[in-house]
């Protein structure tokens, strides 16, 4: 029990006034004081669910399915000597540590047949990346996903999680999400707006989440949310799908925000009922068809999810194209890109998918739909950095290895557990297999740890310094 969880009386009175009649305040308080169950989501860009379960169950991992996400599991481990975030499987991007309720919005987005997996999608408030990587996995790295984050301090962790999970179809931006309705009207096939909120549903992982809670602050946040939702609606194509979600409980930030959009544009869209989204979803369904997940219903965080479909265009008084600086990349000429791609295929048996662009001594792989937003939006990062060039050639990057290394049919070395430990500690290794030449993908149990280079019978370690770990990562 978290007996120190801060639940102020004025907050509890507020909740009691909106709690559905069939739910108990005593159970609500008790659930808020219980530790949150640990949950993870398998990253199917790297491994199938069946293969992940087969790999981890012999290590004493008990995986109980999350009913609303077919790649999500509640987790308990027999051996917790290695912190979950420091396991080799996590660092290789095989799974993402994600609260179970937060898997719901993306499930709702992709449960709609109108959501194009190869289309142009927007995650309007993306960091730290749990839902962004979930979307990218369901897109199978096809199309393009714009991942926007307003907080500059959270961009680095978003980028790191995208690289770790092998995501290649994302362009990262750093704006107040209200600009999308202004700059990119009717551009996106599907949008997730997991809006900034008061976080009332997150007390089980942060006992001080409500330390500064007040009705006044909720009203201020709700006004911001209304502006974000209206802008996202303008950025959505007719026929497109939008999911609005929060990790809070108050009606002002949830139902009332949805109602504000209905009041303005109700004839142009409709909300879907999510009562059949998963077995037992009706337990959290509101009369409007939204999901209002109270923490005691599914023993999870509190969450809210609503899904709408846009039927018609609406007048957009927001439209105002953004001012962009000079784009620092140039398309790589075919005489340079084609030989490079042939060399990569010859060496590793895999062909990077996308368009090659160059900047200074860098070669980048951009998503295939990038041209649809080129010149309309300033990006902090697009796709993945494929290689760094020098006088005598180029050097493939660690992030390329994480994205494509598992699919390589040659040009890789498989390490045993002892050598894998050494490699993740930043040390060179002497594999048992016959030595090769040049760059080599380093794998353990079929999954990529990083890049190395053959020097005689030794593989020289090329792990980025920030990924070197002094402790054992293998159970």
Curated annotation (Swiss-Prot):
Domain of life: Bacteria
CDD domains: AdoMet_MTases
Keywords, sorted A to Z: Cytoplasm, Methyltransferase, RNA-binding, rRNA processing, S-adenosyl-L-methionine, Transferase
GO molecular function: RNA binding; rRNA (cytosine-C5-)-methyltransferase activity
EC category name: transferase
Catalytic-site annotation from UniProt: 247 (nucleophile)
Database matches in Gene3D superfamilies: 3.10.450.720, Vaccinia Virus protein VP39
Entries under InterPro entries matching the protein: Methyltr_RsmF_N, MeTrfase_RsmB-F_NOP2_cat, MeTrfase_RsmB-F_NOP2_dom, Nol1_Nop2_Fmu_2, Nop2p, RCMT, rRNA_ssu_MeTfrase_F, RsmB/NOL1/NOP2-like_CS
Binding residues annotated for S-adenosyl-L-methionine, in chain numbering: 125-131, 149, 176, 194
EC numbers: 2.1.1.178
Gene Ontology terms describing biological process: rRNA base methylation
GO CC, any one term: cytoplasm
Classification via Pfam families: Methyltr_RsmB-F, Methyltr_RsmF_N, Methyltranf_PUA, YebU_pre-PUA_dom
Record localization: Cytoplasm
NCBIfam families tied to this protein: nop2p (TIGR00446), PRK11933.1 (NF008898)
Function: Specifically methylates the cytosine at position 1407 (m5C1407) of 16S rRNA.
PANTHER family, A to Z: 28S RRNA (CYTOSINE(4447)-C(5))-METHYLTRANSFERASE-RELATED, NOP2 YEAST -RELATED NOL1/NOP2/FMU SUN DOMAIN-CONTAINING
Family statement: Belongs to the class I-like SAM-binding methyltransferase superfamily. RsmB/NOP family.
Protein name: Ribosomal RNA small subunit methyltransferase F
Lineage of source species: Bacteria, Pseudomonadati, Pseudomonadota, Gammaproteobacteria, Aeromonadales
């Amino acid at each position: 029990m978290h007996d120190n969880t801060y639940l102020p009386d004025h907050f509890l009175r507020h909740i009691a006034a909106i709690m559905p009649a069939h739910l108990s305040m005593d159970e609500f308080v008790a659930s808020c004081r219980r530790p949150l169950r640990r949950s993870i989501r398998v990253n199917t860009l790297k491994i199938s669910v069946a293969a992940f379960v087969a790999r981890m169950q012999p290590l004493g991992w008990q995986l109980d399915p999350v009913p609303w996400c077919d790649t999500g599991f509640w987790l308990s481990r027999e051996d917790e000597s290695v912190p979950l975030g420091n396991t080799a499987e996590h660092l290789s991007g095989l799974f993402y540590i994600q609260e179970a309720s937060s898997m719901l919005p993306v499930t709702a987005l992709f449960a709609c047949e109108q959501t194009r997996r190869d289309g142009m999608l927007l995650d309007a408030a993306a960091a730290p990346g749990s839902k962004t990587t979930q979307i990218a996995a369901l897109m199978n790295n096809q199309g393009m996903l714009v991942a926007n984050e307003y907080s500059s301090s959270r961009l680095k962790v978003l980028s790191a999680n995208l690289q770790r999970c092998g995501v290649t179809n994302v362009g990262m931006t750093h704006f107040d999400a209200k600009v999308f309705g202004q700059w990119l009207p009717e551009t996106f096939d599907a949008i997730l707006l997991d809006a900034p909120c008061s976080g009332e549903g997150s007390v089980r992982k942060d006992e001080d989440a409500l330390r500064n809670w007040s009705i006044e602050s909720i009203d201020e946040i709700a006004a911001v949310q209304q502006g974000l939702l209206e802008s996202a609606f303008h950025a959505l194509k007719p026929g497109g799908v939008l999911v609005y979600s929060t990790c809070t409980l108050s009606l002002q930030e949830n139902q009332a925000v949805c109602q504000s959009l209905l009041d303005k544009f109700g004839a142009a869209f409709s909300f879907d009922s999510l009562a059949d989204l998963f077995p037992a979803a009706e337990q959290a369904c509101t009369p409007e068809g939204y999901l209002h997940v109270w923490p005691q219903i599914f023993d999870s965080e509190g969450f809210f999810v609503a899904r709408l479909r846009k039927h018609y265009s609406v007048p957009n008084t927001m439209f105002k194209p953004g001012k962009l600086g000079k784009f620092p990349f140039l398309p790589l000429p075919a005489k340079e890109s084609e030989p490079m791609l042939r060399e990569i295929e010859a060496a590793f048996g895999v062909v990077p998918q996308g368009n090659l662009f160059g900047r200074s001594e860098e070669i980048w792989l951009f998503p295939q739909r990038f041209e649809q937003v080129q010149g309309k939006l300033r990006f902090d990062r697009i796709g993945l950095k494929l290689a760094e060039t020098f006088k005598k050639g180029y050097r493939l990057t660690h992030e390329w290895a994480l994205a494509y290394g598992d699919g390589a049919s040659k040009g890789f070395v498989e390490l045993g557990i002892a050598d894998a430990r050494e490699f993740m500690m930043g040390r060179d290794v002497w594999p048992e297999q016959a030595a090769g030449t040049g760059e080599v993908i380093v794998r353990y149990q079929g999954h990529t740890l990083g890049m190395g280079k053959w020097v005689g019978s030794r593989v020289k370690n090329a792990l980025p310094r920030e990924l070197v770990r002094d402790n054992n990562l293998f159970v």
